[in-house]
Amino acid sequence: MRHRKSGKQLNRNSSHRQAMFANMMVSLFHHERIVTTLPKAKELRRFAEPMITLAKEATVAKRRLAFSRLRDRQAVVKLFDDLGPHYLARPGGYLRIVKYGFRAGDNAPLAIVELVDRQTAAAE
């Protein structure tokens, strides 16, 4: 029975899912914008938004917790030095998910996941 199980399975086992979302978060924090399938994008929000909330208070313990989830030093540095202070006044809703059409090979629905008020938007 499915009682009290949250989150989508996405046809992956738990370790694959955990690694996939960690990699997606690293890419999102590094590039501030990624393209993925719509179900993955909606599920990624459950993991990425609490990480940005975690980065608002830059303590050593929170950095270690973020590193244990991301396993990427550069992503943790950018998260705590750039993104955390940037979103200090915002109480949540750090990500924007925009539908992006369908993938050519299998017609899967695509979505753009980007940080709201991202810093590199002015450069584009």
Curated annotation (Swiss-Prot):
It comes from the Bacteria. PROSITE patterns: RIBOSOMAL_L17. Part of the 50S ribosomal subunit. Contacts protein L32. Belongs to the bacterial ribosomal protein bL17 family. GO terms for biological process: translation. This is Large ribosomal subunit protein bL17. InterPro entries: Ribosomal_bL17, Ribosomal_bL17_CS, Ribosomal_bL17_sf. It comes from Acidithiobacillus ferrooxidans (strain ATCC 23270 / DSM 14882 / CIP 104768 / NCIMB 8455) (Ferrobacillus ferrooxidans (strain ATCC 23270)). Keywords: Ribonucleoprotein, Ribosomal protein. One of its GO terms (molecular function) is structural constituent of ribosome. One of its GO terms (cellular component) is cytosolic large ribosomal subunit.
